[in-house]
Amino acid sequence: MAYTVELDIAGRQLRLETGRVAKQADGSIWASYGDTVVLATAVASQNAKPGVDFLPLTVDYQEKAYAAGKIPGGYFKREGRPSEKEVLTSRLIDRPLRPLFPEGYYFETQVIASVLSSDRTGSSDVIGITAASAALAVSNIPFLGPIAGVKIGRVNGEFVVNPDLETLKGSELDLVVAGTADAVMMVEAGANELPEATMLAAIELAHAEIKKIVAKINELRVLSGNKPKRSVVTEQIAPDLAVQVKGLVAQGIRDAIMIPNKSARQERLDMILKETIDKLKNPDDPNRERHVKIIFHGLEYTEVRNMILEKGSRADGRGPADIRPITCEVGVLPRTHGSALFTRGETQSLAVVTLGTTDDEQRIDALEGEYTRTFMLHYNFPPFSVGEARPLRSPGRREVGHGALAERALKPVIPSKDQFPYTLRIVSDILESNGSSSMATVCGGTLAMMDAAVPIKEPVAGIAMGLIKEENRVMILSDILGLEDHLGDMDFKVCGTKRGVTALQMDIKIGGITPGLMHQALEQAKAGRLHILSCMQKALEAPRTNMSAFAPRIFTMKVKQDKIREVIGPGGKTIRGIQADCGVKINIEDTGIVTIASVDGASLEKAKEMVNRIVEEVEVGKTYLGTVRKIMDFGAFVEVLPGTDGLVHISQLAHHRVKAVSDEVAEGDQILVKVLEIDRQGKIRLSRKETMPAPTGAGTKDQTSG
């Protein structure tokens, strides 16, 4: 039997239905919002994975081409590997769901959100969050939700709930919030340098809408039978073993976590753990080693948090609001277009900028339609950055997600195409990592663009904030280490300029965060961001005025649309000839925008002149160096511009009387001519004698007729 709930959100009907499709899944939801339809399913294995002590959760978001009435491209004509948007949306759904599974739940669980119909409004991501949560809520899978997702835009100073794509184009905010009825669990935002107070107000508005949706999901859960959740049996560890381990390692852990160097600290902790396992070996207990590890890591978790909460001290000796030492270098690679090495503590990013032409734009065919990207940021996290040896693979979800966050942070300061007609690619290679590598990418990317003479509006910096919360004891941390990210309760990344926020990303591991704590974290992040910006500007205060000698020079001009065909020539002959002759790249858009690119300035000027000659229109009174194309009895036809001929009448060839045209000019000669007239039919009358010095001597008469 099917059960349905409905709710009006921002003037469109949100409909959640269960019991009609995918009934063999543990939970399934058919969610519709406008004409967008998302099917979300949740399935968990019946038995926990043996030896697993983590949540084996997989979340997949997929867009069916048929949802937008399309057939996939490529040879096989079917959906292939996930697109970047699908990867990012999978992460967007995963992040708020993951903390809401109970401790000790180690059953393999898969959540799939499939877009079956798209009205091209761009709402499928937040519907995916809501539908996935609802699928878990109506299932028997243990889940501490439900949650819901809402998008907020801001146009003309007013907030807009779940804006469509057209509205977002003019919006200074693109914010996605997911949360329970009680608290916010996840934030993902891009903004045009908005104040912290505005960001907080938008998050609070989103949470108010989330509460309404969560209430409807709970209503649907009751309607559909309120399935009892599976019991989660946590592994029992002998209390006397816990006492033994604590006695052996507690002081050693306290000493080890105060070692500032990450590698040395981890080496010491690993040694203590190994010694403890060796001391407490029991051949009759096959789980002994695993239990010792669980107890040990639990003690490490407790000691790190207690040290911060009780002493206000961190593993590297900093206070809660302190930033690690920063060094910035620019121009570190001689042949690249722009480069920077940004180091903060034990985290280091090598950021490199490459400038390209319109040929280098990324063309994307999405459900919402085709579009191009002229700015790209790619983040790489090689294994050596954390002292590991493992095979190199194509970028994973984490790398795609970190790159997208840094790209979103920098995008608001990128100049428009009119100001800077380049395709811009930034690559961030993480050379070492101990937390906040995505934020190092933002800082390094800013410096690399400035080194490449990209006229950015303002420098951007990023900082990762953390939270340690035990009941009423709370500590917010600035510029968190990997250890604090792993053992803390929040990862809150804030990027922006001195004027305001350009990107936010927040993930909570506990039951949520209150607006008060969020406000405190944003204000502390602002102070840290301004400090980082001041360090960056000591290395390079403003974008360079001169580009690298190895970067392409680009000239942009606009021609009349009826001239495009002339520039291209029959079968592309003309444009290919110019490119071959001058060693340049030329791109012509349907709008008449012509882009000429070359590393060599002289070649650029030559190509520019050749294009100008093609598109130039003849002007009355102007003198041209033309080529005689044909001789007739009554005059000569002269090509003054490519493809444009005019007639020099025999009477206009010279000041003296001309008996035969061939006496003065021959085909192929180049002569100066002046335009006398362009008649209604477009015929051009030229004169050669008007460009020649007047004859001297009394009584000399010009030939005036012919």
Annotated model-derived regions:
Residues 552-554, 561-706:
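Single-stranded RNA-binding regions, centering on S1/OB-family and related RNA-binding modules
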Residues 25-110, 115-122, 181, 188, ...:
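Glycine-rich, flexible beta-strand/loop modules in the N-terminal catalytic cores of phosphate-handling
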Residues 103-109, 144-146, 213-231, 263-264, ...:
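Flexible, glycine/charged-enriched surface loops at secondary-structure junctions
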Residues 27-29, 122-140, 330-353, 434-454, ...:
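Conserved phosphate/anionic-ligand binding catalytic regions in large, soluble enzymes, centered on
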Residues 1-45, 232-368, 552-566, 574, ...:
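Extended amphipathic alpha-helical scaffolds
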Residues 140-260, 449-545:
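Mobile "lid/hinge" segments at catalytic clefts and subdomain interfaces of large enzymes
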Residues 1-233:
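Long, basic N-terminal domains or extensions that often function
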Residues 33, 42-44, 61-63, 113-117, ...:
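Flexible glycine-/small-residue-rich
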